[in-house]
Structures are given as structure tokens and as C-alpha cells.
Amino acid sequence: MEKKILVIGDSCIDSYAYCRSTRLAPDKPVPVLEVLDTINTPGMAYNVFRNVVSLTKFPKGIDLLTNERYEDVVKTRYVDAFSNHMFMRVDSVVNIDRIKDNNIKDGYDTVIISDYDKGFLTAEDIEYICTNHPQVFLDTKKILGNWANAARFIKINNHEYERSKDYFQNTNVQDRVIQTMGSEGCYFNGKQYPVEQAEVMDLSGAGDTFMAALAVKYTETEDIDSSITYANSCASKVVKKRGTTVVWEKLF
């Protein structure tokens, strides 16, 4: 039976300007960058969506609800073309309109909220969606509050976990929190899930891939243990690649 997944969140364009620098500016001691190549890919929630489509057996059942004109929201990373060292990141300043309708149509087996806290979703919107759908996977840059209580699973990295510690200490949600810890894998419900060691080329988008793989596998199996293991494996493949990319089911 075909599964349906909806991804909700704010999107952008991830732009990678691959450069070389052979001299310093004459007026200031800063490197002069010569851009050799530029690669643009959809990022943030759109990257989660792309990964879900690439991993699921039912790509026609995958939908995305995101901000209009997401192409105007650009994160530009200036990266050395040879060492992959990132010189700097420049973000465009764009006001993102709030979601127009947070009523989710029936028929979705899973909803993924990928909230980068750029204005598309408020805490009230997230609470409403989680309350009105039984299987929401939540990944948010907001400091968590009681509005997140109804999420089926909360995926959170170390930095965001520390910011939301008060919430975790005062609520009973630990059995639904998946804490990602980079090269140390992730932690869920008292168990650590190790990840294969890999030479890291770029961490950009690894969290998106983890979230997509986790939700896809759980939608298929309803087994959170195997879903976390699968998500770890997918994320470890992505960090070996440059830029914001997707992982394909055929690799497994």
C-alpha cells in the first residue's frame, strides 16, 4: 500500500561558491577569492523533501508545504575548491510569510516538520499540526516548549538540546526525543546508536538526511530502532559529499 508523507517547513537555496585564493588584498589583510564554480541546490525543508523522495518507494505520495519564493532566501557559502575549507557564509535577509493554512489534509501517514525558525511556522502552528496528526516528526531551531508535547518524535542536535534543557527537565517526553551527536551517532531512550566513522567532507544537510531517512523507514516499518540505525547510515553517506546533497535508496 502506498504511503504518503508531507514535509512542512521553510526552504531556501543553498549556494556553494567554490573558490581559490592566491593572494591577500592590498588594502586589508584578507584573502581575495576567485570564484571557480557555483552550485545552487534547494535547502532546509526542501532538502528534507528531496531526501524523502529519493529514499521512499512511493515518491508520488510525497508532498512539500513551504514558503513561496523560497529561491529569494539564499545561503551562500564561499568554499576553497581544493581543501573544502569554508571562508565564510553570507545569508540574504528576506522576510518569510507565515504559513497560510496549517490545516493538514487527511491521508498522510506521516508529517515531517522541518522548522528553521525563519518565520514560516510559529510555535502555535507547530502545536496545532502536532495535535491534529498522530505521527509528526519534529525538527525545529526554536527553543522547545509545551507546544511540542504532541509530536510523535522530536529529533534534536546537541546544541539545540542544551538550549531546550529546561523543557526536557520539566516534561515527560524523553521517550520520544532522538538526540543526534555527530560522529558519536545518536541517543534515544537510554540507548546510544553508534555511526560508522567516515571522512567528513561537508556536514551541510546531514541533519536533513537523517530526519528524512528516519521518517521514511519508520513509516514503512513502525520500528524506531531500525529506523534510527538506517538514518545514521544515510547521514554517514551524505557527509562524505560536498554541499547539500541527497542520499539514494539504491546505495543501500
PLM regions and their residue ranges:
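Conserved N-terminal subdomain of the carbohydrate kinase-like
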Residues: 3-5, 13-113, 123-125, 245-252
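Generic enzyme active-site microenvironment
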Residues: 5-8, 112-113, 137, 155, ...
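Short beta-strand/turn micro-motifs composed of small residues
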Residues: 9, 53, 66, 140, ...
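Active-site metal-binding loops of divalent metal-dependent hydrolases
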Residues: 10-11, 116, 209
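Conserved beta-alpha-beta core of the PfkB/ribokinase-like small-molecule kinase fold
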Residues: 22-28, 75-93, 110-169, 184-185
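Catalytic cores of large soluble enzymes that bind and process phosphate-bearing ligands
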Residues: 37-44, 117-121, 153, 160, ...
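Short hydrophobic/aromatic-enriched beta-strand-loop microsegments
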Residues: 59-64, 153-158, 193-195
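Conserved phosphate-binding/catalytic region of the ribokinase-like
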Residues: 94, 107, 125-150, 165-252
